[in-house]
Amino acid sequence: MTEELSLENDVMYTTAEAAPVIFSQNSGVERGKFRSLTLINWNGFFARTFDLDELVTTLSGGNGAGKSTTMAGFVTALIPDLTLLHFRNTTEAGATSGSRDKGLHGKLRPGVCYAALDTINSRHQRIIVGVRLQQVAGRDKKVDLKTFSIQGVELSVNPTALFTETLNERQARVLTLNELKDKVEQSGAQFKQYHSITDYHGMMFDLGIIPKRLRSSSDRSKFYKLIEASLYGGISSAITRSLRDYLLPENLGVKKAFQDMESALRENRMTLEAIKVTQADRDLFKHLITESTNYVAADYMRNANERRGNIESALNFRQEWYKAKSEQDLSQHRLVDLSREAAELAENEKTLEVDHQSALDHLNLVLNALRHQEKISRYQENVGELTERLEEQKMVVETANEQLEESQAQFEQTEQEVDNLRSQLADYQQALDAQQTRALQYQQAIQALEKAKTLCGLADLAVKNVDVYHEEFEAQAEVLTDKVLELEQKMSISEAAKTQFDKAYQLVCKIVGDVPRSAAWESAKELLREYPTQKLQAQQTPQLRAKLHELEQRLNQQQSAVRLLNDFNQRANLSLETADELEEFYGEQEALIEDLSAELSDLVVQRSTFRQKRENLTALYEENARKAPAWLTAQAALERLQDQSGEQFADSQGVMNFMQAQLVKEREFTMERDQLELQRQQLDEQISRLSQPDGSEDARLNVLAERFGGVLLSELYDDVPIEDAPYFSALYGPARHAIVVRDLNAVKEQLANLEDCPEDLYLIEGDPAAFDDSVLSAQELELGVVVQVSDRELRYSKFPEIPLFGRAAREKHLEELQAKREEVAEHYAQRAFDVQKCQRLHEHFSQFVGLHLALAFQDNPEQVMARTNQQRNEIERELNQFLTGEQQIRIRLDDAKERMQLLNKLIPQLPLLADDSLTDRIEECREQLDLAEQDELFIRQYGVTLSQLEPIANTLQSDPENYEHLKADYEQAIQLQKQVQQKVFALADVVQRKAHFNYAESVQTETSELNEQLRARLEQMQQQRETQREQLRQVQAQYAQYNQVLIQLQSSFNSKNQMLQELMQEIGELGVRADEGAEERAKIRRDELYQQLSTNRQCRSYIEKQLTLIESEAENLTRRIRKAERDYKTQRELVTAAKMSWCVVLRLSRNSDVEKRLNRRELAYLSADELRSMSDKALGALRTAVADNEYLRDALRLSEDSRKPENKVRFFIAVYQHLRERIRQDILKTDDPIDAIEQMEIELSRLTEELTGREQKLAISSESVANIMRKTIQREQNRIRMLNQGLQNIAFGQVKSVRLVVNIRDTHAMLLDALSGNQSDYQDLFTDNRMTFSEAIAKLYQRLNPHIDVGQRTAQTIGEELLDYRNYLDLEVEVYRGADGWLRAESGALSTGEAIGTGMSILLMVVQSWEEESRRIRGKDIVPCRLLFLDEAARLDAKSISTLFELCERLDMQLLIAAPENISPEKGTTYKLVRKISGNHEHVHVVGLRGFGTTE
């Protein structure tokens, strides 16, 4: 703060100094000079040194002689900036900027080139500065530049000899830069190479080679533009447009005062921002340490968990390996047992398959037999039915045949009679007259009589006895008819007997085959005698079959029981055979099952008890596992509190007591802090009063002094030495703050209008420029001063112990006050820190109480978990023992139950096992069944036949052999009957014609009557014939129908009988009995065998599956064993490798004291995925956090290798080390970054409060700014006037004088008026803490000048420009030219020579101004070299050149001119340059002249 105010004082008091004359010489100090220019390996100059004249050096020569190249070398050595160098007369026209070589590439030759300036400064030091140039290969024609300087070289050493090495008398080699360095250092001189142009120019400024320190590229640009303007002559628009930047010096005092004020405010605000940034950094560091801890600790705990998990996995793999081996052994034993059992089942299955196939074939045969039997029964029924129908039909046919024959006979007789009648009628009709008819009738009667005689064999037959004979024959016919009827009856009876006999005979033959008719009765009698027995046997067949089935079932059960017994003995490894042994063993097994069940129940109860205990312990373990992370977090928080507080807490009450003590301690520290704050404020007020630039303790005095046009007395005595300060302080007494004015009377008039002024205002009349203490009559005493105020008033003032009169006294007292303030501030900071620390500690304790107090003092959950886990493991071992015992008991119990099941199956079948006669009974029953089935088959085949035979069997006793004789008698009787009837008919005809015998006399009269009778008889007989014909036809049809039915029945009978015989033959060939239960028995047998086969197959399939499963399990077990072994070995290798890495991690963490940070036990309860997620999230945050820190970034990148977890620990150590290095040990008294972050937070909070208060004190008023700007502008206006006085005598051609015109811009004048006027309109800008003063003044400028477009510039940039007084001024150059008077200096209004002269004058003013500006920052014994250029001097006439020479002599300035050959100045040194070409070699021949005199 003191430095800022002192700088401001310097600024404000420069106005009181007289501005020096621009062309005044520096008395006592010689100006530095350029001695020579050396060009090495330039185009035309292999090694040439041009000695420079102290005034003017002229380069004379024709076009292309090398004048511009020489000047280019000089400029390049002076300003080696490729961005600025631009030699226009050699630049390729129309070339693009990318390929343009700026005219330098073509001036060089291939290889190493040099351009060096040999100078001697005001200290008589020889300095060689230069640049090494080298063409860069490529189409862009680039040039590489390296700057260097050489000091300590003797004056006798030629610069050319430094840069070359002489090979022989005519040859030399250019040295490289390294060779040059070695050569210079070997000679004892100092060689230095520069890596930046700024360093190069800084050296040149410090040693007095250039007039201004070129700090930036803009400074170099100004210098180059000045050189360029000098080189090409004329008025440079680039310079005249920005003449303020060249001529008006930066008011370093004012600017520095504003900058210091701004920088102080900015620094203060930046400090506040930095505090915020630091707080953000603190948050970042906190974030960094938190994320680093999360990143590394999560990986650390994950690796620890994985290591523990890997070890457990290795043990599990080994256990799995051993377990798989034991399972393989058991599997192999089981495989052998099951293979043996599978072989037995396979053999048994083959037997069962054969039996089942036999049963299936038997079932098929039975089914076929049953189907055949059904067909036989059906056919037997059909045949029996057909036989009956056939017999009936035969009788019907015979009856129909007899009717047919009788009808035929009647029809034939009627037909014969009709024929007779027709013949008679024909005969009668032939005789148309009666005689003829009578004669005919008579003749016919005679014929009939003759016929009757013939037929009857009666010779004596006559008309008279014809009746007798007729009656006799009728009686005979009746006798024959009776006989025929009798015979017919006998025939019927005989025919029936014959039919029954035949039928019975056929039935017997059907049963027993062909037998003689005589033996039929015996066969029938034997069949009928055995028929009831066979029928009874057939009826007993189902019972016998059921009995046989039952016996076979018992046999099967006996066989099953035998197999079951054998199986039982095999399984039980016993040899029990008798029922007593089995029952005894049964009792033993029952007792064993009861004992094992009771023992198993006890084990189950105990196991349940242990499981309940295990569940309780598991619940307790899980509860503590859930509680453990929070408890560990609480313990970590408790440890942090104990570390922060230095106390040990045994219970929660101790924590509460400590919090209460902290509150009391905080109140004490707060009271001390407030007292120190009060002391600091008092010291700040004193320092603020003493820090006023003019020594006034009241700012109103400055306003009044400016208003009255006076100067503060303290300002006039500001330079009083400190030893005189007590005297002058006592001399003026209360008037030490008086205002010195030129005229008291003028001031008196203004006193009445004063509103704001101190209570006591002292005014002293005098000249502020020549004021002394003669105005007072005083006498100095030992301890004070007596002042005669008036004739009647004396004032005695003691010498003050702490004088404040004068800047030196104030500064001394300020130093004391500031030291005291710093001490108070340090104590205040310490107390504030303590208060903050107490508050933070109390806050931490409050957080701990709210979050962790309930858990922190409970038992360690991990210890409880360890005890619980131990108990749980013991219970697990006991449970495993119980499970093993229970498994053994269950196996024994299952075996016993299985034996009991087998015994339960065996015991009911004990009687079967003891039944030895079962097989014999089955054989006996089977024989009876065979007989019964044979009888049943016989009855089934012939039962119907026998039942038909039984009622007619007696007919077989007598064979009806007389049937043929009776039939012959019957036929004979029929024949006799027919003959007798013929005779009767013949006699009847005679009897009927008896009357015709009388026609002998009356034939004529009776012919017609006879004819009618014959006709009626004929008609009657015809009708009878037709009736008989119809009856015959019907009888024939009926007979044919009956005969057809008979034929059909006979055909059906024959086919069905044949089929029946075939079926009986086939069923006989099948060889099975087709009884009612045969199918059921076959099916039951088949189903039983199928069930046994299915059971056997299921058992075999199950066993084969078990074998396949065991084989696959064996393969799986083999793979499992290999895998378990491989996994175990891999896991063991992994554990071994992880152990090595883990040992490295532990060693690093323990040696670096970070194990406690990394071993966060609460993370051990998170899963690997959660820890990996936590680590990955932290890694992502860390990548952002360390992005700007290369070391940490590389460490973090290395730590990402998961194969090397130790790199993460190294990264954590690097973070800790990095944060430790960032700890300021002067502020923070700790090495722990986490504690440092806490202390930093407290310290930053305190600094924020302090700096916020300081910002309010640093603010400067707008009125003060306006006053400072006005004073500075007034001073610079005076300096410009002094410059104009030095330019009045400069004349070039018609230009008689040159001057500078400076004016204040209207817009800026309005700004100054606003700053010093009413502040109510813009006070909001300067009271806004968010804006700097520069931004506030920029905003005010924009308000006052809204029409001005500020473009894209920020308010800060505009404000900084407004704090530079040069921006308030407009500066122009005017020339007085002939009759035109004062004109603005422009190239178009002046001739070439006038423009060059005017421009050169302006440049001289600029150089002089620069030297004056830099005088304060350059050594006092250094006056810089002063040299300008002028190319193409032919544009100046001889008078102008002489004027330039005179100007150079007056200003002690060197000038380098390039002129054509026709110009030869009389003064200075002239070099004639001639470019010569000899063969392929080109060089410039140089001849040096001083004036027109001798050649050097």
Curated annotation (Swiss-Prot):
From the Swiss-Prot or TrEMBL record, state where the protein is found.
Answer: Cytoplasm, Nucleoid
Q: Extract one GO cellular component term from the record.
A: cytoplasm
Ranges where the record places region Flexible hinge = 693-810
User: Whose protein is this, by species?
Assistant: Aggregatibacter actinomycetemcomitans
Source superkingdom: Bacteria
Binding positions (ATP): G61, G62, N63, G64, A65, G66, K67, S68
Query: Which UniProt keywords are listed?
Result: ATP-binding, Cell cycle, Cell division, Chromosome partition, Coiled coil, Cytoplasm, DNA condensation, DNA-binding, Nucleotide-binding
Summarize the subunit comment: Homodimerization via its hinge domain. Binds to DNA via its C-terminal region. Interacts, and probably forms a ternary complex, with MukE and MukF via its C-terminal region. The complex formation is stimulated by calcium or magnesium. Interacts with tubulin-related protein FtsZ.
Coiled-coil regions listed: 332-496, 537-608, 665-692, 806-832, 862-1066, 1101-1139, 1235-1290
Domain topic, free-text comment: The hinge domain, which separates the large intramolecular coiled coil regions, allows the homodimerization, forming a V-shaped homodimer.
**Family the entry assigns:** Belongs to the SMC family. MukB subfamily.
How is this protein named in the record? Answer: Chromosome partition protein MukB
Q: Which InterPro entries match?
A: MukB (IPR012090), MukB/SMC (IPR050308), MukB_hinge (IPR032520), MukB_hinge_sf (IPR042501), MukB_N_dom (IPR007406), P-loop_NTPase (IPR027417)
- Bilayer-crossing residues are none
Q: What does this protein do?
A: Plays a central role in chromosome condensation, segregation and cell cycle progression. Functions as a homodimer, which is essential for chromosome partition. Involved in negative DNA supercoiling in vivo, and by this means organize and compact chromosomes. May achieve or facilitate chromosome segregation by condensation DNA from both sides of a centrally located replisome during cell division.
Q: Kindly state a single biological-process term from the GO annotations of this entry.
A: chromosome segregation
Q: Which GO terms describe its molecular function?
A: ATP binding; DNA binding
Q: Which PANTHER family match?
A: CHROMOSOME PARTITION PROTEIN MUKB (PTHR42963), DUF4476 DOMAIN-CONTAINING PROTEIN (PTHR42963:SF1)
Predominantly, its location class is cytoplasm
